[in-house]
Regions:
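Alpha-helical multi-pass membrane segments and their bilayer interfacial helix-loop junctions
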Residues: 1-520
Length: 520
């Protein structure tokens, strides 16, 4: 590094031509990388010094000769090529001599330097950045596996996300300041979308390769998390830009549906090739389901139309998990069904939809599908290829949430039907609806208690207790304020009947405690 500082000083004082000085600095950096290679071959303790100094010097010279107004000598194409060459040399050193340091400095350094090259006073060209970051990720993931190198992969992913957000910022900032520049910003949008899509495919391939090659206890957190994180980052940034610029939004959401289907195809292919007990499929399946949930409402034109399809997709996914013997896919199906129901609650509470018939149809479909989903889960034990079912939920108690989702959808269906039967101009309409809601909740709870008793099903009994608690909270903390007269009397009476039924059934249940069929 002393020689490098001498070269810089001589160049600054004009003793040698600046262009010649820059080229000498690049040549000296390559020389240090070469010396580092041969030092590693001889197992010299000084080898890391040459490799690190050569890599750092290369990145400093390339960025300065491109950005510094004194130079501006190195165009973007050769600058990025030099970064890639230095990264390849560092990765080759790691691969040949089984040492971590060259890979760490080489890949992370080239990614950082490539991002720095975009911090230019003029409009930067991000197309070269795509190639360099892709090369850094490939080198970081496909170079020989070494212990304690996970931070390199996380760093590369973080830098890739930061670079895309920086790119999006450079595209959208002029538009936010001056809307008339939107036309020129739209010209950059296809390149941004192509770059984000390319990285999405790359990370999917990386995760699939690791899942196929690894074993259950060796698949790291990074490879399990990267598909979902990629969907959140890639779809989120693309959705934001296309929405603000009002361009390619529908196309991006439709393409996302296709990509979500590709995720399921990848899961199917991996399930055919993996060894027994090998996990990791749920990571890719979860990413595909998330992409489906994010993009389908836009493609359908209304969220209320998309929710029944999401519910059906969740049911299909648990059947798919049975064929694949994937506990991860099964857990994803639970989450997707819960998401659809929670989204339905959000739409109804915020009154985002004003079509009663559409709501009734959606609630009816989701009630039926959620219950079928629950029945399938209770008829088929979950695979234990993921830690969730192997350690935390061995008896699949989480499937009870599916029955709860069916009850929620059914409640809104019946509540919508009763609301439609009561004229909007009727006096005391709100109080009447409040009383009817309590009757629906408490009546459902009483029915569940009887169903659980005659079916010897503890799970349904426990859910009935939860529903009764919800009904009681509604009666005493809402109905006493919002209702009066006959609706209030009926509301309180319905809760009393439900608790009476529960009390009688619970007293008789004690006689059946020793029955083997009672277990859920």
């Amino acid at each position: 590094m002393v020689i490098a500082l001498i070269l810089r000083t001589v160049t600054d004082y004009g003793l040698i031509n600046r262009q010649l000085g820059a080229y000498m600095g690049i040549g000296y950096a390559l020389l240090l990388l070469g010396i580092g290679w041969f030092r590693y071959a001889k197992a010299s303790p000084q080898a890391p010094v040459f490799t690190v100094c050569g890599s750092v010097l290369m990145y400093l010279v390339v960025t300065e000769t491109n950005l510094n107004p004194k130079f501006h000598l190195l165009p973007l194409l050769p600058a990025h090529l030099l970064l890639i060459v230095s990264g390849v040399i560092a990765a080759a050193t790691t691969n040949r001599f089984r040492v971590r340091l060259p890979l760490s400095i080489g890949t992370v350094g080239m990614a950082l330097a490539a991002i720095v090259l975009t911090f230019h006073e003029a409009a930067p060209d991000f197309r070269f950045l795509i190639v360099t970051l892709l090369a850094a990720n490939i080198l970081g993931h496909f170079t020989v596996r070494l212990d304690r190198c996970a931070w390199v992969r996380w760093s590369l992913f973080g830098l890739t996300v930061f670079a895309s957000l920086w790119w999006a910022y450079r595209i959208i900032l002029p538009v936010l300041a001056e809307p008339s520049t939107a036309a020129s910003a739209r010209l950059q949008l296809p390149w941004f979308l192509a770059g984000v899509g390319l990285f999405g495919c790359a990370y999917l391939a990386i995760a699939a390769r690791e899942i196929l090659a690894g074993k259950t206890d060796r698949i790291g957190t990074y490879f399990l998390a990267i598909p979902t994180l990629t969907v959140l980052w890639a779809f989120g940034s693309a959705q934001y830009l296309t929405t603000v610029l009002n361009s390619y939004n529908y196309q991006i959401n439709f393409l996302s549906l296709v990509v979500s289907a590709i995720h399921l195809v990848v899961v199917w292919v991996l399930s055919r090739k993996r060894t027994e007990g090998q996990g990791g499929l749920g990571a890719i399946c979860n990413a595909g389901a998330l992409l489906l949930a994010l993009s389908l409402p836009t493609v359908m034109g209304s969220a209320i139309y998309a929710l029944p399809i999401l519910s059906i997709a969740a049911y299909a996914l648990i059947i798919f998990s049975g064929f694949c013997q994937s506990g991860g896919a099964r857990l994803t199906s639970y989450l997707l069904q819960i998401h659809a129901t929670v989204y339905l609650i959000f739409l109804l509470i915020t009154k985002k939809t004003n079509e009663p018939l559409d709501v009734l149809v959606a609630c009816f479909i989701m009630t039926i599908i959620s219950y079928l989903h629950y029945q399938w889960a209770r008829s088929n034990r979950p695979p234990t290829d993921i830690r969730f079912f192997e350690r935390y939920d061995q008896k699949d108690f989480s499937a009870a949430l599916l029955l709860l989702m069916a009850l929620v959808s059914g409640f809104f269906m019946v509540e919508g039907m009763t609301s439609a039967l009561i004229s909007g101009d009727s006096p005391g309409r709100l109080a009447t609806l409040t009383g009817l809601q309590s009757i629906i909740i408490n009546g459902t709870a009483a029915g569940l208690v009887l169903w659980g008793y005659f079916g010897r099903d503890v799970e349904k009994r426990n859910i009935a207790i939860l529903v009764i608690v919800i009904g009681g909270l509604k009666v005493f903390f809402h109905d006493l304020v919002a209702a009066k007269g006959l609706p209030l009397v009926v509301s309180v009476l319905s809760f009393g009947v439900a608790t009476a039924v529960l009390s009688v059934i619970m007293s008789r249940w004690q006689k059946r405690m020793a029955t083997p069929d009672e277990a859920p």
